[in-house]
Design a protein with these regions (language model features):
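Outer-membrane beta-barrel domain signature
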Residues: 57-61, 95-102, 155-158, 188-192, ...
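Outer-membrane beta-barrel "beta-signal"
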Residues: 346, 392-406
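Gram-negative outer-membrane beta-barrel proteins
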Residues: 39-47, 92-98, 130-134, 188-192, ...
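Outer membrane beta-barrel
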Residues: 27-41, 58-187, 195-197, 201-218, ...
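Bacterial N-terminal signal peptides that target proteins for export
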Residues: 1-11
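N-terminal signal peptide c-region/cleavage motif recognized by signal peptidases
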Residues: 20-22
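Detector for outer-membrane/organellar transmembrane beta-barrel domains
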Residues: 202-345, 356-358, 393
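Flexible, surface-exposed loop regions and adjacent strand-edge segments
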Residues: 49-51, 102-105, 140-145, 229-235, ...
Length: 406
């Protein structure tokens, strides 16, 4: 009898202890990544700002189709349809093993937030701004890659190189095909809410075979009145200005960069789809800038994608960029770019690819010294050649590679 009573007490106590343990929400963490290595040929390569001394080059180039990376992402169910989310992503040179950013462990992405299907998503940290998030489905980089296929120098920020620090971002739930998003990146400059800040907004409509988006962004230099790009500027590439290329080298000292873009796409059937974009980009001077007139670049582009079989993808793209006459330039620069891509899927995660690109530049632009240095415009394919443009008006590039996603 005593033994039976003791057993009963043990069961009761055990049940009480179990009942007193809080019910923790379900959570998950996923490790993911991309390793991409290729062999690339470039017909002319020189240092940024040079218009002579270019030579052809063949080299191993990582991240030609997609930047090599690894990351962690996950979430926790908070109840009521709300989840906490986070993402940490680090870039790397898969040819050498070196980190993409020497001063940032998770230089690609580092944010945390909450999401709810009825109320939308709010995130805080280093991330892509709303401008890119909603325009990216119609970006040329989807099928002809940013390395070769971004509009010259990624002039309009439609590739993934533009990330902003200290960003607060809200994206609405999709309602009747419509999504709205806005982001603000705090510059953190004492005495100013404007210096170094980045703010963007975008609207997207996607329903059935049709997709459309429009976006605007304003990137402010943290250096008052323009000048050398301040380290406190929220939109940075390892602490330096993003997207400096042969197109924009003479406008690095801008007080602000302003972008407006429209993109759209149409899916004809399972084999064919097309996307198109237009952008207006302005480099706005300040009292300390090395140029005096706003530099404006208008770009239009189109990409046709064909999938004849499950394992094959082919794409062709064309873009035209033209600068306005300003800062003493009467023959303004223009850039025509042609792209082809071929992708063969070995599996859902692994593929082989080939890429070809040609760009032709015409007219004049500013050199490193700004308005005091008018030079011939030189070619700079996509954004993979921002630091190694051609020394002449034309440039051809060809790449072969393998990519694996995990």
């Amino acid at each position: 009898m005593k033994r039976s009573t003791s057993s009963a007490k043990a069961v009761v106590i055990g049940a009480a202890l179990v009942g007193s343990v809080p019910a923790f929400a379900q959570s998950s963490v996923t490790l993911y990544g991309i390793v991409d290595n290729g062999l690339a040929y470039q017909s002319s390569s020189t240092s940024l700002g040079s218009t002579s001394g270019g030579h052809s080059v063949v080299k191993m180039t990582p991240g030609v189709w997609a930047g090599s990376r690894f990351g962690l992402k996950g979430g926790e169910d908070l109840g009521g349809g709300t989840k906490a989310i986070f993402q940490l992503e680090s870039g790397l040179n898969s040819g050498t093993g070196a980190a993409q950013y020497t001063n940032a462990l998770f230089g690609r992405l580092a944010y945390v937030g909450v999401t709810n299907a009825s109320y939308g998503t709010f995130t805080a940290g280093r991330q892509y701004a709303s401008y890119y998030q909603l325009l990216s489905p119609y970006s040329p980089t989807t099928w002809i890659t940013g390395f070769y296929g971004a509009h010259p120098g990624d002039i309009d920020g439609l590739d993934t190189i533009y990330r902003a620090n200290n960003t607060l971002e809200y994206t609405s739930p999709k309602l009747y095909g419509l999504t709205v998003s806005g982001s603000y990146s705090l510059g953190g400059v004492a005495g100013s809410v404007n210096q170094g800040s980045t703010w963007t907004g975008a609207v997207q409509y996607a329903m059935g075979p049709i997709g459309l988006a429009v976006g605007f962004s304003r990137i402010n230099n943290s250096t008052a009145g323009g000048g050398a790009w301040g380290s406190d500027s929220t939109t940075t590439n390892g602490g330096s200005q993003v997207g400096v290329s042969a197109l924009t080298n003479g406008y690095q000292t801008a007080r602000a960069q302003q972008r407006f873009a429209v993109g759209g796409g149409y899916t004809f059937n399972s084999a064919w789809d097309v996307t198109a974009t237009y952008s207006n980009v302005q480099y706005i001077p300040g009292i300390n800038s090395k140029f005096t007139d706003t530099a404006i670049f208008n770009t239009g582009g189109v990409v046709l994608h064909w999938k004849p079989a499950v394992v094959w993808d082919f794409a062709a793209g064309y873009s035209y960029t033209r600068a306005t006459r300003a800062n003493g330039i009467t023959d303004s620069a223009s850039y025509q770019q042609f792209n082809l891509s071929q992708y063969y899927s070995l599996s859902k995660r692994t593929g082989l690819y080939a890429l070809e690109a040609y760009q032709r530049a015409n007219g004049k632009t500013l050199g490193t010294n700004g308005a005091g240095q008018i030079i011939d415009a030189t070619a700079s394919i996509g954004d993979g050649f921002n630091s190694t443009p051609a020394s002449s008006a034309s440039q051809f590039a060809f790449g072969l590679g393998i990519i694996h996603r995990f």
